[in-house]
Amino acid sequence: MNKLANGPNYKVKPRRRREGKTNYYKRYVYVISKQTRFIVRITNKYVIVQIAKIDPKGDIMIASAHSAELAKKFGWKGDENNTPAAYLTGYLAGLRAIKRGVTECVADIGLHVPSKGNRVFYVIKGAIDAGLKIPIGDISIENDRIKGEHIAKYAEKLKSENSDLYSKLFSRYLQRGLNPENLPSHFEEILNKIKSSGG
């Protein structure tokens, strides 16, 4: 139930907090620390990564990566916001940050809940594997999920049980010419392309 705006002590939260965009307490901590931030945001369609440095005049963007680039530049045929895409976007951002002289960052996951299996940690894992140092504590990362093996297994099972639902759920993959059962090998192909490009 929403708290009603009444009484002399009611305080309106800042606009960006009301919109679910900024956690001002965390923002304050980042500003005080003066460390370079590895910013991860995941929308309903995409994964967005930015590496930014705090500056009194505003954040200075050092490098960035967007999961839409995976399809446009590297031929990715899966969804742009699933776990493998999250890892690949993080890896791409990590390579670009290193290219610009960044070696260490702190993770800024915004208002994402740091729960087990959250895709934000797969983005960070991608950047770490690219060579960036980002402390994430004791978060467990499942390697089979990085490659999309869980998606491939589910697709294989669904195809044999309900082909109509299979075609509906994986329509984007199929339209792009990828059988979702082959996602792990496709992931490896795209990862190698990103490595070869150097970011």
From Swiss-Prot:
The lineage of its organism: Archaea, Thermoproteota, Thermoprotei, Sulfolobales, Sulfolobaceae. This is Large ribosomal subunit protein uL18. This is one of the proteins that bind and probably mediate the attachment of the 5S RNA into the large ribosomal subunit, where it forms part of the central protuberance. The keyword Cell inner membrane does not apply. Belongs to the universal ribosomal protein uL18 family. InterPro entries: Rbsml_uL18_euk. One of its GO terms (molecular function) is structural constituent of ribosome. Keywords: Ribonucleoprotein, Ribosomal protein, RNA-binding, rRNA-binding. One of its GO terms (biological process) is ribosomal large subunit assembly. Part of the 50S ribosomal subunit. Contacts the 5S and 23S rRNAs. One of its GO terms (cellular component) is cytosolic large ribosomal subunit. It holds the Pfam family Ribosomal_L5e.
